[in-house]
């Protein structure tokens, strides 16, 4: 699967997410963003929401459920804006691809 096809899938996934969350950004990161995927690579996606609907442990199952409507290889990671202390989201912002 090429990068354009992956991005098109993620645009559709973002639209689904926007029906349930106040989405600020969605990023493709990992092997597809770095243009070195293998045949068995998953699709790493960072989802940044302005505010969680409930709490992380209630919202995370929903993003996983929604991905099944698009592609089971999507591996979403949920972030609440301004709450990531690890620096992981900043690295994704710098190296990932914004999904518009």
Predicted regions and their residues:
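Glycine-rich beta-strand-to-loop/alpha-helix junction loops that act as flexible
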Residues: 29-31
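Short, well-ordered beta-strand segments
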Residues: 27, 44-46
């Amino acid at each position: 699967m090429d990068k354009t096809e992956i991005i098109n899938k993620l645009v559709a996934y973002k639209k689904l997410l926007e029906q349930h969350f106040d989405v600020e950004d969605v990023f493709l990161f990992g092997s597809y963003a770095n243009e070195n995927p293998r045949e068995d690579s998953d699709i790493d996606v960072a989802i940044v929401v302005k505010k969680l609907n409930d709490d992380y442990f209630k919202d995370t199952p929903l993003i996983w459920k929604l991905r099944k409507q698009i592609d089971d290889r999507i591996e979403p990671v949920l972030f609440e804006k301004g709450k990531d202390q690890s620096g992981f989201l900043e690295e994704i912002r710098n190296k990932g691809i914004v999904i518009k």
